[in-house]
Amino acid sequence: ESLLELNGDEERLAKLFAELEFKPMKGSANKPQTKDKNKNLNQNADKPTETKKIDSNYETILTQKDMKIWAKKLDDCKVFAIDTETDSLDTVTANLVGISLSDKEGEGCYLPIGHQYEGCPKQLDLKSVVDIIGSSVEKNRHKAVGQNLKFDIPILLRHGIALDSFHADTMLMSYVLNSTATRHGMDKLAMYYLNYETVKYSDVTGTASKQINFSSVEIDVASHYAAEDADITLRLFNKLDSLLAEKPIQKKLLQDIEYPLVHVLSRVEQNGAKIDKNKLSDHSIELSEKIEKLSSEAFKICLLY
């Protein structure tokens, strides 16, 4: 009998779930309980069945002339998105394969630098990219928007472009705005906030045993994928920025804590952290003593009941 289903206090549950931000549970607290054996099969029924299509104009940059045009665009725009493509996720050793930019929604470009495959066309040399695009990015760094810039900043720095400040990071904007609404990768954010299904990394590189390195992806395929990344990042920024405008506390948290930490954590990841072994050992002993004391107190409390 103790396993029988009991009626809950739905009103109190709803208030508690709202206070603790248990959003999926909050909705279920006000719904009558049913014994639908198939309810788990329909858990995504409230998600949009059709995704939005967007107009886009993406281009591959292969000449200094076109690079200068985009450098001017960065000078003239109010905000721009930047993203890097690499041959590895290790920021210490990864090589830069290309850079993508977007200065307005629907517009984007890709600058291929390090693709390697048979029949690969001539690409931009790194020095000219740093001299033309890099100098413009550095000059306009206060306009720069990215998605997880903690990855891009050290990659760019190792290849000669110092993005030592930036305007916004959409991953952090999403997390601060609502940490539990969705995962904070770009693909998930695009679906959640823009109702748009992006081209996935696996769509261009393949999966499992057939997966290839991004440097082996043909430039025309890589170009659309990368330029879309920058375009969607800019669209996400515009959306999230409008939502955060109504939440001054979260916006202050972003500016005062989250964004400065990006550079701190990036430096720690690149350079490591110096640790005082003696202090660490002493602290370990102190924590062990506290754990033992709390454990003893917990057992005493249990014996009382």
Residue spans for each PLM region:
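Conserved small/polar residues in nucleotide/adenosyl-binding loops
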Residues: 303-305
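Active-site-proximal helix-loop-helix substrate-binding element of RNase H-like nuclease domains
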Residues: 50-58, 90, 94-246, 255-259, ...
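Short His/Asp/Glu-rich catalytic/ion-coordination signatures at enzyme active sites or charged loops
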Residues: 1-12, 214-217, 261-288
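Accessory alpha-helical DNA-binding modules that contact the DNA backbone or grooves
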Residues: 1, 33, 285-301
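Generic beta-strand/beta-sheet core signal
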Residues: 82-85, 102-104, 112-114, 147-148, ...
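Short amphipathic alpha-helical segments with heptad-repeat character
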Residues: 227-230, 234, 281, 285-288, ...
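Long, highly charged low-complexity segments
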Residues: 2-99, 113-118, 122-136
